[in-house]
């Protein structure tokens, strides 16, 4: 995506959304224009948020001068991808995270792997403690390590895939189209942050306004389906998040 394309898409979203999350599965730190995107988003009144696997933090010191409001680092990706040398990884993550937090960015170190690849969680927390000593303040979802610096834990869930079997859940729920949408690099609007392949295209921001797209028959059917706790789209029927989200407060 070019800077002009980003400018066009964010202009289309201005006044309609508040938060911009710079990922739809991809690794945002790979994009050379990420600092410019963040600064433009701030100028337009958006609140930018980045989720990253943290492997490129040491190479992107330029981001320290163009920090988002919030930086989420998925530590669980390290064990899930079978990477070596966790000490070096945590070293690089913590060096960037502590500096970003001191500059006012909210940094969340995520361990979203309960019930899955979580064998290294204990050692990872110990490595973090070597670089940000305990005691930490316990929270409902993890710990506060210092001002603007947190560790957050959550259950692992299975990403949606049309090749998966349908979940046999009597009730499902999702925040798609309630408090989130996704926009792919080509302008395609999808219902949520998990539809990275564009399996549920609702329209394109280069062709239509967001309000026109959200009023489409496909979008309204999906929204009303989740209102009645039913997944109407094949991809949603194969999504681990909607299957486990009964533990969340259901919104009408």
List the predicted regions and their residue ranges.
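C-terminal accessory region of radical SAM enzymes
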Residues: 100-107, 132-169, 194-244
